């Protein structure tokens, strides 16, 4: 909840389920013992990110074609140091090694140029209404 508005943030219970189903798809950065940034998301054969995916960790398919990114999170005090970018690069590298078709995430308008720097292409407004927000679907095809 420190990284996202309450309506958009995953609950502790949702994170527990995510860790249970796809712990290998969390990219973490620590400062000493403190978690300061992380990226997470599951793998699926579905090419588009849906609201259902945020809520149902059990939809993870380890052999799926697409790495979804549900959150790029950095605590406010550690933002603008490149930590999120490092984790995004690690997620991209892992997806390549695993033979995925690519990665998909959604973001608000102001972040489209940020994700474009990593090779993500804006595919237009997403069907997702997660947190009652308009999201752009971004895709990086490998």
Where are the language model's segments positioned?
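Active-site rim helix/loop that mediates acceptor-substrate recognition in acyltransferases
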Residues: 5-32, 36-59
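C-terminal "cap" of GNAT-fold acetyltransferases
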Residues: 108-109, 124-142
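Conserved acyl-donor/pantetheine-binding loop and adjacent beta-alpha core of acyl/acetyltransferases
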Residues: 38-73, 79, 89, 128-135
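Conserved GNAT acetyl-CoA-binding A-motif
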Residues: 88, 93-108
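Conserved G/P- and acidic residue-centered "switch" motifs that form tight phosphate/ATP-binding loops
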Residues: 82
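A short, well-structured alpha-helix characteristic of acyl/acetyltransferase catalytic modules
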Residues: 1-2
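Conserved acetyl-CoA-binding loop of GNAT-fold acetyltransferases
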Residues: 116-126
């Amino acid at each position: 909840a420190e990284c996202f508005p309450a309506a958009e943030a995953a609950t502790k219970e949702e994170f527990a389920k995510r860790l249970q189903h796809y712990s290998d798809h969390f990219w973490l950065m620590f400062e000493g013992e403190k978690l300061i940034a992380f990226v997470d998301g599951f793998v699926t054969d579905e090419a588009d990110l849906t609201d259902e995916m945020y809520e149902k960790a059990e939809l993870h398919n380890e052999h799926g074609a697409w790495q979804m990114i549900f959150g790029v999170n950095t605590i406010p005090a550690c933002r603008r140091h490149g930590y999120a970018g490092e984790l995004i690069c690690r997620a991209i590298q892992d997806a390549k090694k695993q033979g995925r078709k690519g990665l998909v995430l959604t973001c608000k308008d102001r972040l489209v140029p940020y994700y474009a720097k990593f090779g993500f292409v804006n595919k237009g407004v997403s069907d997702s209404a997660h947190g009652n927000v308009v999201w752009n679907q971004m895709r990086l095809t490998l």
